[in-house]
Amino acid sequence: MAKTKTGIFSGSFNPIHIGHLALANYLCEFEGLDEVWFMVTPHNPFKNQADLWPDELRLQLVQLAIEGYPRFRVSDFEFHLPRPSYTIHTLNRLKQEYPEREFQLIIGSDNWMVFDRWFESERIVSENKILVYPRPGFSVDKSQLPPNVHVADSPIFEISSTFIREALATGKDIRYFLHPAVYKRIIQQTDSIDSSHSCHT
């Protein structure tokens, strides 16, 4: 029986936006993946991540964003691994726990350019399939790729979570950059924080 081809889309999703969703949608419909798992990365105590939203909020926003599309799944798998967690450890644990699945690591071309700096990068490439999606300003020479690495011909989405956070912080109405349920939840969260702050001032 063929294994379920499962893309691991790991990120902070701080917050998740339509660029993330459209990319994952493309990879399922045009690149042969059966499912995409949004692997929300936890706060790393060894890094300065002052602008990182709480783990549970980011997880909840992804869940809201993917509801109704059966080929997407949100995962808190890395929340339960020792920190700092490394990609090689995550992939090995996933393969142990889900032997019926063929996991493929989804990364941007910007990350591929510095992939040799990743922990155990050679093992990751030799033992796993990697699906690289294009990022603006980071073109990949396909003729130089290892056999396990494939570059997707997906559209380039020039939206960043940093842009989303900065726009929200300045009161911009950017509802069409986010899934409606995500936008609604963020506005509720912001109103709650503002109300709490005003009660204490």
From Swiss-Prot:
Enzyme Commission code: 2.7.7.18
Pathway: Cofactor biosynthesis; NAD(+) biosynthesis; deamido-NAD(+) from nicotinate D-ribonucleotide: step 1/1
GO biological process, one term: NAD biosynthetic process
Gene Ontology MF term list: ATP binding; nicotinate-nucleotide adenylyltransferase activity
InterPro entries: Cyt_trans-like, NadD/NMNAT, Rossmann-like_a/b/a_fold
Reaction(s) this enzyme catalyzes, per UniProt: nicotinate beta-D-ribonucleotide + ATP + H(+) = deamido-NAD(+) + diphosphate
Keywords linked to the UniProt accession: ATP-binding, NAD, Nucleotide-binding, Nucleotidyltransferase, Pyridine nucleotide biosynthesis, Transferase
Gene3D superfamilies, per database record: HUPs
Family: Belongs to the NadD family.
Function (record text): Catalyzes the reversible adenylation of nicotinate mononucleotide (NaMN) to nicotinic acid adenine dinucleotide (NaAD).
The name this protein goes by in its record: Probable nicotinate-nucleotide adenylyltransferase
Organism: Bacteroides fragilis (strain ATCC 25285 / DSM 2151 / CCUG 4856 / JCM 11019 / LMG 10263 / NCTC 9343 / Onslow / VPI 2553 / EN-2)
